[in-house]
């Protein structure tokens, strides 16, 4: 299971009238819209239903998770709890060994053009990923996807993209840089 925006199942505006008047191109960039119903509970219910099907031992999410939605602090505490529960459930029970996510770049100016969160959020998610792995005695990997030569990306941005992930990942965990090659 998974795909683009894998954890956005049933997410839409709480009040469709507000959405109809909205001129923004994204409900999640540069910040998560207060009108977005970002409840991860319906998706957790699907995971549990799939896992209960006869012949299914375990279901996996391979990629497509928007970690910015999981890290966002919502005004509604029940949404924060659902995001936290989803994050732990995802990492502990629905990763087959590698979870692929798409920070897509390391430079904030390029990421703004892509409507993606700051690369620092990838680091925050990596720390949570590693913590849950330790807590459950797992040895899973978080694999970042990057895009090169995006319009608006300079040669200096590309040079930073070439070195930043290795430097950050080695400082975030005991993950060996040589494993990135």
Where are these regions (language model features)?
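Structured loop/turn residues at beta-strand edges in well-structured enzyme cores
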Residues: 94, 168-170
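Generic low-polarity alpha-helical segments
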Residues: 50, 90, 165, 175-176
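Conserved SAM/AdoMet-binding glycine-rich loop
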Residues: 1-143, 147-151
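C-terminal accessory regions of radical SAM enzymes
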Residues: 156, 160, 172-173, 178-181
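Catalytic cores of alpha/beta
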Residues: 78, 150-167
């Amino acid at each position: 299971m998974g795909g683009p925006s894998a954890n956005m199942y049933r997410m839409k505006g709480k009040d469709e009238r507000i959405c109809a008047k909205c001129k923004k191109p994204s409900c999640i960039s540069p910040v998560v819209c207060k009108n977005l119903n970002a409840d991860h509970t319906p998706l957790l219910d699907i995971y549990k239903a799939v896992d209960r099907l006869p012949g299914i031992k375990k279901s996996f999410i391979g990629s497509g998770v928007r970690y910015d939605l999981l890290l966002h602090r919502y005004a509604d505490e029940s949404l924060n709890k659902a995001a936290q529960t989803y994050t732990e459930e995802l990492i502990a029970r629905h990763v087959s060994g590698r979870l692929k996510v798409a920070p897509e770049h390391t430079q904030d100016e390029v990421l703004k053009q892509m409507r993606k969160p700051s690369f620092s959020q990838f680091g925050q998610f990596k720390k949570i990923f590693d913590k849950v792995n330790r807590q459950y005695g797992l040895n899973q990997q978080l694999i970042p996807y990057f895009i090169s030569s995006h319009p608006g990306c300079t040669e200096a941005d590309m040079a930073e993209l070439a070195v930043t992930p290795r430097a950050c990942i080695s400082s975030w965990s005991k993950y060996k840089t040589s494993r990135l090659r």
